[in-house]
Amino acid sequence: MRPAILALSIFLLAASAPAVDREAAKASYRQGNEFFDQSRFADAAAAYGHAIEQDPQFLEAYYNRALSDEMVDRQKAIADWRQFADLAANSPDFKYQAGQGSARIQILQMLPTYPDALQPSHYVSSAADYYAEIAETSESERWTTYPIKVAIGNVPEANWAQGAREAFSIWKEMLPLELTAEPEEADIRFNWDPDQNMEGGEVGEEMDWVQFRREGNELTGRKVAFISVDLSRRWSKDEMRAIVLHEMGHALGIKGHSLSKGDIMYFQVQEKNRQVRVPGVYYPFAWKTLVSKPSQRDLNTLIRLYNTPGVVLRMK
């Protein structure tokens, strides 16, 4: 090729490349961060996309877009993480984040197809969530087969049984649960032993165990959640419903507590009325008005827990 023609080709190629507008990209990126912090994940992903259009080498925007799309569309998130990992592999400053991206791709690909109630489309941005408060203790606590089978068992008092059944029915309206009379078939089981000891004045507790079975030459394990309630107190039906709602929230994956008194995973502090203790909290709690069902924040937290493959913070 003649030198003049080669020079012209290079000029035309450079002219056709998109112009980089770093200031505009930074403005779009800041907007994306604001949306992300407001739990407006679809808007955040779009804003980060604009930042990438304005600066195709803006690695932080690729990273945060992938995080946002985890709460929008799993396949988009996988594509985003691949794009980020490919670009970051050539940048020494982003070597660790590139590894994070590759790991998240693997986890996202292994996650099952969730029931409709756990899809990101049911996340209500205006209600937000308390995922950051429970994420580290709740990671890998997702149920992967549905419906989740629950055995309430033989409840010693009729009003307690009614409260427990009401709690089950409330959660069943939101998630695919199935009541079973066979404890060995259940994923979530209740212990109504009146002689059980609760530590530190706790009203109830939830614990997870792995149950092993031998099938031929193979040993298989499955997670089982056990819920216990302090039966030494004279609970009303509504109090039992609130206790079971709360403990089932733990069993479904929320291994922590909300800081908002409107959530079922928080018990309101009061000076009067009945006082109880919540596991892991070292001061008395009491009910003045009982939360009657999981809040949208409770549901949002479950949705985010099930769709987010581990705890990472967005880039600043």
Task: Describe every region a protein language model picked out.
Residues 21-36, 63:
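Alpha-helical tetratricopeptide repeat
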Residues 30, 64, 97, 101-104:
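Canonical tetratricopeptide repeat
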Residues 99-159, 210, 294, 304-316:
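Disordered inhibitory propeptide/activation segment of secreted metzincin zinc metalloprotease zymogens
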